[in-house]
Amino acid sequence: MHAEEKLTAETFPAAPERNATLEGKNKFLGFWLFLGGETVLFASLFATYLALKDKTNGGPSAEELFQMPVVFMATMLLLTSSLTSVYAIYHMKNFDFKKMQLWFGITVLLGAGFLGLEIYEFNEYVHEGHKFTTSAFASAFYTLVGTHGSHVAFGLLWILTLMIRNAKRGLNLYNAPKFYVASLYWHFIDVVWVFIFTVVYLMGMVG
């Protein structure tokens, strides 16, 4: 079946990511290799943070600094966005392009809300004198959490680009795997944040 062939809900494959074009399958493999590299990157950042988290240089500790209500709200937004992306892929596999776009749109809004809260959080810390150069702890914290934030921004841009570029095309075997891969990437970002929330924030609050 070619990407250009007219598809219907009856002929659209249940797992379009497995019925992609050869080019799409190669990109799918490349994505998993990319994700492996991303995992190594974040593992190294976590290791660095754990090694430096007590090096406050007389500045505030994690327990004194973190604003948990803001962090909790941001966490809920990001976790909910993971659920909405699941709904988007569900509708994609049922060949309902409009509902897929709707749920991806909600995912983008939730992700943007998460980023907004993270920027607010960083701004508050800076105003309290907790800057990147304040201590080794501060540098490790901003590097880890900021790197994740940049990945969230990239994921939002990726999903938005797919939504806009394919708004008039609808679903086919060429673009369906792209939406699927973008959703997988978004789940990866969410999983990384769960580790950040646990290791950085929760463990930081208990000392």
From Swiss-Prot:
One Pfam family cited in the UniProt record for this chain: COX3
Highest taxon of the lineage: Bacteria
Transmembrane spans: 28-48, 70-90, 102-122, 144-164, 186-206
EC number: 7.1.1.9
GO biological process, one term: aerobic electron transport chain
First and last residue of the signal peptide: none
Gene3D superfamilies: Cytochrome c oxidase, subunit III, four-helix bundle
Membrane disposition: Multi-pass membrane protein
Principal subcellular localization: membrane
Compartments where located: Cell membrane
Catalysed conversion reaction: 4 Fe(II)-[cytochrome c] + O2 + 8 H(+)(in) = 4 Fe(III)-[cytochrome c] + 2 H2O + 4 H(+)(out)
Protein's UniProt keywords contain Membrane: yes
Keywords in alphabetical order: Cell membrane, Membrane, Translocase, Transmembrane, Transmembrane helix
GO terms for cellular component: plasma membrane
Any one GO molecular-function label of the UniProt entry: cytochrome-c oxidase activity
PANTHER family recorded: CYTOCHROME C OXIDASE SUBUNIT 3, CYTOCHROME C OXIDASE SUBUNIT III
Family, as annotated: Belongs to the cytochrome c oxidase subunit 3 family.
Protein name: Cytochrome c oxidase subunit 3
Species assigned in the record: Bacillus sp. (strain PS3)
Gene that this sequence comes from: ctaE
